[in-house]
From Swiss-Prot:
Residue ranges the record marks as coiled coil: none
Membrane topology (UniProt): Single-pass membrane protein
Taxon lineage: Eukaryota, Viridiplantae, Streptophyta, Embryophyta, Tracheophyta
Keywords in alphabetical order: Heme, Iron, Membrane, Metal-binding, Monooxygenase, Oxidoreductase, Transmembrane, Transmembrane helix
Any Gene Ontology biological process: brassinosteroid homeostasis
Pfam families: p450
TM regions (residue ranges): 13-33
SUPFAM superfamilies registered for this protein in UniProt: Cytochrome P450
GO cellular component: membrane
Native species: Oryza sativa subsp. japonica
Primary gene name: CYP734A5
The protein, known as: Cytochrome P450 734A5
Protein EC: 1.14.-.-
Length: 537
């Protein structure tokens, strides 16, 4: 009896083990089949699909796609500064993979970011299709989760109806009249910075002072936004947000340069734990801003009081969010507002200052205009800004040559025809903004030269130019909501600087633009400032 039971149990156990082993093998086989489909067979089908339509590119390599060659080209380009040292022909250095592969495969070609196909499109009419006429077929691509965590899950990273709703909520705040309440904070910040610079120039003996404007100009948005949003009493909270975001940006930049591995960000590695801590601290400081924002909203606008702490401007500017958004949504939106507000403005000021230092004739023209419009003593006001035409042309030309975002990406939501080519669903479409801005077909033979006159109101070339040939802040429905704010702040800041100082490049300056998250000078931007006498100003 015992032996019979043991035999039966042994047979049943063996059968169970065999079934489990078979199930495991089936699961392993299915997983391997899915991996092979995702990492090999589908990319090969997509590659053949585009090749049949005459679209080619560097061949797909298992798992890594074109990434290894792309990184090699980027590293090689970054190893050498610009030649000649004041050249604005920076496309081969900033987007070397585009410059290289376009010569081999044409303006429309296929590259691979990991297993994801990216169709590169640089012709303005095709860009119009992606961003305007066929925009319903495309969506903003899914950014790396760490980028989203850093920027915030706000307007720039939302999709569909959630994005449309948020855009409707935010748009009224960026009306021109609302933006102008920020101008005094920018002017006041720059004035304090210039007072310090003038003191340094006097103390130095030579009557001039050298600063790295790539770092120095970060104070403009940082202090203006912090003071306007948090006031004097909570200034340290605002400053902490920027300091913590700077550290988090390093981790986000590193993650952005690598192929994304799903789930890796949840592993308790040393870097991930630090990222989580930084995010918690940023949220904690921003929560105080949200509390003040909600208080401002509950005070019904005109009755709101800053409590004598000097804040209120930014709170009034952003108070429209409080009734329509939760505290968590405001925090996410504020993350992006603080980061984008700082990086976009500081980089625009940096490259404009570098360009004007390279081209003193335009620096002097802008200075004469500022003095004529604003006078010799008063700070720029909202009434002055529309009259600063030359300064506006200079800013546009700087944005053309040195756009903050050198490319943008959209994802095909479904199979869609683009320029006679059928683009499969899931394909990313990359628009190299800098390449379009530097294209001689759109801008003429002097496309690589600094010539603000091309943006003059009476310039015939501007009237003939394709509307998608200039898009420093993107295009279509998802164009940057803060572009007018950045231009307004830059005009105010530069007007204050030009009236008080003349400047030139330091002998230590090395012209080496590169892309991290946005376009920035690889080795900084040291500039020498000399105070102007009242007679010369």
């Amino acid at each position: 009896m015992w032996s019979s039971w043991a035999w039966t149990w042994s047979w049943s156990g063996a059968a169970a083990v065999a079934v489990a082993a078979a199930a495991a093998w089936v699961a392993v086989y299915a997983a391997a089949a899915r991996a092979a489909e995702a990492l090999w067979w589908r990319p090969r089908r997509v590659e053949r699909h585009f090749a049949a339509q005459g679209v080619r590119g560097p061949g797909y390599r298992f798992f890594v796609g074109s990434s290894i060659e792309l990184v090699r080209l980027m590293v090689d380009a970054a190893s050498r500064p610009m030649e000649p040292p004041t050249s604005h022909d920076i496309l081969p250095r900033v987007l070397p993979f585009y410059h290289h592969w376009r010569k081999l495969y044409g303006p429309m070609h296929l590259i691979w970011f990991g297993r994801t196909p990216r169709l590169v499109v640089s012709e303005p009419e095709l860009i119009r299709e992606v961003l305007l006429t066929r925009a319903d077929h495309f969506d903003r691509y899914e950014a790396h989760p760490m980028i989203c965590q850093f920027e915030g899950y706000g307007l720039s990273n939302l999709h569909g109806e959630r994005w449309a709703r948020r855009r409707r909520v935010l748009t009224p705040a960026f009306h021109t009249e609302n933006l102008r309440m920020i101008a005094p904070f920018v002017a006041g910040t720059v004035t304090r910075m210039l007072d310090e610079l003038a003191e340094r120039a006097r103390a130095g003996g030579a009557g001039e002072a050298e600063v790295d404007v790539a770092e120095w100009f970060q104070r403009v948005p940082q202090e203006a936004i912090t003071f306007a949003a948090f006031g004097r009493r909570n200034y340290d909270d605002g400053a902490a947000v920027f300091r913590l975001q700077d550290e988090l940006a390093g981790y986000a930049t590193e993650a952005h340069s690598k192929v994304y591995i799903p789930g890796y960000r949840f592993l308790p590695t040393r870097k991930n734990r630090r990222v989580w801590q930084l995010d918690r601290e940023i949220r904690s400081h921003l929560a105080k801003f949200v509390t003040g924002l909600q208080s401002c909203s509950s005070s019904h606008g005109d009755d709101a009081d800053d409590g004598g702490d000097g804040g209120g401007g930014m709170r009034e500017f952003m108070s429209f969010m409080a009734p329509a958004m939760t505290a968590g949504e405001i925090i996410e939106e504020s993350k992006n507002f603080f980061f984008a507000g700082k990086e976009t403005l500081s980089n625009l000021l940096t490259w404009t200052t570098v360009a004007l230092a390279m081209h003193p004739e335009w620096q002097e023209r802008a200075r004469r205009e500022v003095v004529a419009v604003c006078g010799r003593g008063d700070l720029p006001t909202k009434d002055h800004l529309p009259k600063l035409k030359t300064l506006g042309m200079i800013l546009n030309e700087t944005l053309r040559l040195y756009p903050p975002a050198v490319a943008m990406i959209r994802t095909a939501k479904e199979d869609v025809e683009l320029g006679g080519c059928v683009v499969p669903a899931g394909t990313e479409v990359m628009i190299p903004i800098m390449a379009v801005h530097h294209d001689a077909a759109a801008w003429g033979d002097d496309a690589a030269e600094f010539n603000p006159a091309r943006f003059a109101a009476d310039d015939d070339g501007g009237r003939r130019r394709h509307p998608m040939a200039f898009m420093p802040f993107g295009g279509g429905a998802r164009v940057c909501i803060g572009q007018n704010m950045a231009l307004m702040e830059a005009k105010v800041a530069l007007a204050v600087v030009l009236r008080r100082f003349e400047f030139r490049l330091s002998p230590a300056y090395v012209h080496a633009p590169r892309v991290l998250m946005i376009l920035s000078p690889q080795f900084g931007a040291p500039v020498i400032f000399r105070p102007l006498t009242s007679a010369a100003a």
